[in-house]
């Protein structure tokens, strides 16, 4: 057990040291843009297009219809009731403090989306195409501003929307930056490893000058 703890400590120390070395190699947004361009075919093949549209952060409260037809679709009455509840909740919020915090509280109390209810309805770093079309269209309306609200109907139900903020970068940039840094880490690790000779015996492995 002692040797295992020592191994873990060495791994943590080595990882931290590698990160320090990587951090010492500055890069610019132009470097990331060039990295994307150099690998554009690969990114495009994965549906990651270069775009000026930045990622966004949005809160929502999902109100699902309750009541289905024999074919499994929601009844008209169920849709109408869900729409009314969504409008009533939005009006209640507008007549109250109408802050992002109060919206988050309302989401935690009312949203039927298990993926965001515990986080006040928040979805961060949404990029075009991540959500269903109607949700997506509302989020990326060019006129959208922080604090905007609205109601959107999707196949899941009615979404009471709150636009929180626009992110710093577009999705392609974040993905390219992540890949760039991963490659940089590998390159730095190889540079460090090349400075040392490793003994062939795994049992007596050691690093020597």
Feature names for model-found ranges:
Residues 88-133, 164-171:
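Peptidyl-prolyl cis-trans isomerase
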Residues 1-81, 108, 128-209:
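PPIase-associated folding chaperone regions across multiple families
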């Amino acid at each position: 057990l002692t040797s295992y703890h020592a191994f873990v400590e060495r791994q943590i120390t080595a990882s931290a040291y590698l990160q320090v070395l990587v951090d010492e190699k500055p890069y610019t947004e132009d470097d990331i843009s060039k990295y994307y361009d150099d690998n554009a075919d690969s990114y495009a093949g994965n549906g990651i297009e270069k775009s000026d549209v930045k990622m966004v952060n949005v809160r929502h409260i999902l109100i699902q219809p309750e009541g289905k037809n024999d074919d499994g679709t929601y009844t008209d009455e169920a849709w109408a009731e869900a729409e009314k509840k969504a409008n009533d909740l939005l009006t209640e919020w507008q007549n109250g403090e109408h802050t992002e915090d109060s919206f988050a509280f309302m989401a935690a109390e009312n949203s039927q989306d298990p993926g965001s209810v515990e986080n006040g309805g928040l979805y961060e770093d949404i990029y075009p195409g991540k959500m269903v079309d109607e949700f997506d269209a509302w989020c990326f309306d060019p006129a959208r501003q922080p604090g905007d609200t609205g109601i959107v109907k999707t196949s899941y139900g009615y979404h009471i929307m709150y636009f929180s903020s626009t992110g710093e970068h577009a999705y392609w940039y974040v993905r390219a930056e992540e890949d760039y840094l991963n490659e940089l880490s590998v390159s730095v690790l190889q540079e460090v490893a090349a400075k040392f000779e490793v003994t062939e015996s795994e049992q007596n492995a050691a690093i020597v000058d």
